[in-house]
Amino acid sequence: MSREQEVLRRSIFVTFIIAGIGVGFGVVSGSSSVIFDGIYSLTDASMTVLTLLVARLIAAGGVGRHSKLTERFNMGFWHLEPIVLGLNGSMLMGAAIYALITSIGSLLSGGHDLEFGWAILYAAIVVVAGCIMANYGHRANRSIGSNFLVLDVKAWIMASAMTGALLVAFIFGWLIQGTGLEWMSPYIDPVALMVISTAVIPIPFSTVKQALADILLVTPPDLRQHVDEIALRQVEKYGFLSHRAYVARVGRGRQIEIYFIVPTGGAPRRLEEWDRIRDEIGEEIGGEGPDRWLTIAFTTDRAWAE
């Protein structure tokens, strides 16, 4: 099991526990925001399970090149990563939008009462757990560099922020009991839910945007510039006429195709010499490993490069 998968498994385990606690405490306290918090965690945990499966597939594709699985998907599994990331981010945004609509409806209907003691206990537990898991995932990802873990850490930060705001609201509601401000109690839960859901809706947007760009194979400008600079140096060094480069980033994978236009009637080279040039270009591009798909071709016919 890779380090990435280990971190995701622990995140899933803790998230499912928090989700169960959230739904239970939400029912006992009568808090819609706590129930939403639990359902939100459950949604996140379910998507993290899918994320873990995809991470395993990508790892298996990089190691077992001749397995039955890679025979059916011999171009790799990179394309699954942006799909899962986009789906995950979209579902988290959708859950927050639904919570916002629910909170507005509750406000318009006069709010509702709840047991602040149970709600405060739940919120305190989740805030502590969320901060611990966010820090754990962030520290682990320093050496891993996984987009999956980036999104998982964002989810923990979102959960901690949401529940932290709930904790403040619940403590305020508990403190005003028996005072002249007690009339505000029924509105605390829906107002807290409305504020939190509004704040977290845009957080997964950048992840969804990047996932969509990967799915559509939008050319990354930085990668394209890097490849073009290297290819231009090779054109000048070996006397080629020009080159054509095609690049894309799909999840953690980089797909690079370079076609060099060679002069017609040039001096013949042994195949070993062409391979040496390929190796030289590959070393300059960098990132050699299972997450780089590099194709380098030489031709005298421009039509093959277009």
Set out the residue ranges of the language-model regions.
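Active-site cores that bind ATP or allylic diphosphates and position pyrophosphate for catalysis
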Residues: 40
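The first (N-terminal) embedded transmembrane alpha-helix
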Residues: 10-22
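Alpha-helical transmembrane segments and adjacent TM-loop junctions that form the membrane-embedded core
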Residues: 4-10, 33, 47-306
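Short, hydrophobic transmembrane alpha-helix segments
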Residues: 24-37
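Alpha-helical transmembrane segments and their membrane-interface boundaries
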Residues: 43-44
